Amino acid sequence: MSRYRGPRFKKIRRLGVLPGLTSKRPRSRSDLQTQLRFGKRSQYRIRLEEKQKLRFHYGLTERQLLKYVHIAGKAKGSTGQVLLQLLEMRLDNILFRLGMASTIPGARQLVNHRHILVNGRIVDIPSYRCKPLDIITTKDKERSKALIQNYLVSSPRGELPNHLTIDSLQYKGFVNQIIDSKWIGLKINELLVVEYYSRQT
């Protein structure tokens, strides 16, 4: 299944706020209105929607997300927590969380177009897994710096998660540590995502 490129507002109307996909927010709707519009949700549908939230927020294909679930399942600790950590430490997401891109798709474009360096080397793989002590910078070219500056100025600045630091003047971000679960950038029940995939096998 390919990466979603359709109307973004349609997705947030169904799934709720997805800051990685778009900065737009759906109009508030009561739980009763939602239930009347979409009908009573089955347990399967609830699990499916949580999985879709994760997929669309981080901009993944179904195959990519399944791969991350398998990796998380083999790691020590809670599969759901490890899954979220893996997704949060992707380079495209780190750029987004630093405010160097307004959305994760925007961050992915910066990486694909070779504007981004990690530890002084160009990295053009959005899924690159960042590690503690990584230093993320832009190419020393006017166009690259202009793109990042535009994002830093125009992006709404939320509270920076404690595993990251940004030096806006130097167009430089620092990864201090692995992300703590309370700083995950999406309201999600990751256990339902794990359950969804465990029931598919």
Swiss-Prot record:
Compartments it resides in: Plastid, Chloroplast
Keyword 4Fe-4S among UniProt keywords: no
Domain S4 RNA-binding: 89-150
InterPro entries: Ribosomal_uS4, Ribosomal_uS4_bac-type, Ribosomal_uS4_CS, Ribosomal_uS4_N, S4_RNA-bd, S4_RNA-bd_sf
SMART domains noted in UniProt: Ribosomal_S4, S4
CDD domains recorded: S4
Major subcellular location class: plastid
Gene Ontology annotations for the cellular component aspect, listed alphabetically: chloroplast; small ribosomal subunit
Listed GO MF terms: rRNA binding; structural constituent of ribosome
Protein task: One of the primary rRNA binding proteins, it binds directly to 16S rRNA where it nucleates assembly of the body of the 30S subunit.
Oligomer and partners: Part of the 30S ribosomal subunit. Contacts protein S5. The interaction surface between S4 and S5 is involved in control of translational fidelity.
UniProt family annotation: Belongs to the universal ribosomal protein uS4 family.
PANTHER family, A to Z: 30S 40S RIBOSOMAL PROTEIN, SMALL RIBOSOMAL SUBUNIT PROTEIN US4M
UniProt-listed NCBIfam families: PRK05327.1 (NF003717), rpsD_bact (TIGR01017)
Protein name (record): Small ribosomal subunit protein uS4c
Naturally occurring in which organism (per UniProt): Phalaenopsis aphrodite subsp. formosana
